[in-house]
Regions:
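Intrinsically disordered, low-complexity regions enriched in acidic/Ser/Thr/Pro/Gln residues
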Residues: 1-177
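Glycine- and Gly-Pro-enriched alpha-helical subdomains that act as flexible
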Residues: 155-211
Length: 212
């Protein structure tokens, strides 16, 4: 059984017949994300619901997206316990002021862990005066990308319960895919993978999310 999934007996009703069959379900478990500066104690940022797996990427991507982590200041990312439900991100310098988040952030939406919408808006950067023109992608190729993403979703194929975020190059080639119950978590994993690889910025790339 793959990480983030669990086998379970379920009742299936087909063609007027009710029967018990074995199925594979997507599961969520809490992950406590902590951050520690060069000379300080570890501080809890959030407790994030997620399917176990790719936790290093999730924590790194979330902190980067929150503006709490600059890639060149990342020192180490690792689990703090054998159970794998707490992860610590260590920085080379001091931790910036932490956002006021609720204790638990579910997979429902990326804003749910924030204390207020005003806090979200205050953290947004000022819009650029000139919007940089991105890559040009043929419409025919662009319309093919959802099917490419869907065919690569092994977790969804097994459970029917996982979303995905995919990173494509300007030619429409799938470079990276991550799955999660929440699409924002899946995107944080993609971003986190690129941060850990030192592969930022992501200019001339396409991000694609699965739909309902």
């Amino acid at each position: 059984v793959a990480a983030g999934t669990r086998g379970a007996p379920v009742a299936a009703y087909r063609d007027g017949v009710l029967s018990q069959v074995d199925d594979l379900l997507a599961v969520e478990e809490p992950l406590e994300i902590r951050v520690r500066g060069a000379h300080g104690k570890a501080q809890r940022v959030t407790v994030q619901m997620r399917p176990p797996g790719h936790d290093h990427e999730l924590a790194t991507g979330l902190l980067f997206a929150e503006g709490l982590l600059q890639p060149d200041r990342l020192r180490h990312v690792g689990h703090c316990d054998r159970e794998g439900d707490t992860i610590l991100v260590s920085l080379h310098d001091q931790v910036p002021p932490l956002p006021n988040r609720h204790t638990l952030a579910s997979s429902a939406c990326g804003v749910c862990g924030k204390a207020s919408i005003d806090e979200v808006l205050a953290a947004l950067p000022e819009p650029a005066a000139d919007i940089e023109v991105g890559p040009t992608v043929a419409l025919e190729r662009l319309l093919q990308l959802p099917q490419v993403l869907r065919q690569a979703q092994a977790g969804f194929a097994a459970t029917g319960g996982l979303h995905a975020a995919g990173l494509f190059d300007a030619r429409g080639q799938l470079l990276l895919l991550r799955e999660d119950v929440g699409r924002h978590n899946a995107m944080d994993k993609v971003i986190g993978r690129r941060v850990l690889e030192g592969a930022l910025p992501l200019r001339d790339h396409i991000a694609l999310f699965s739909g309902r």
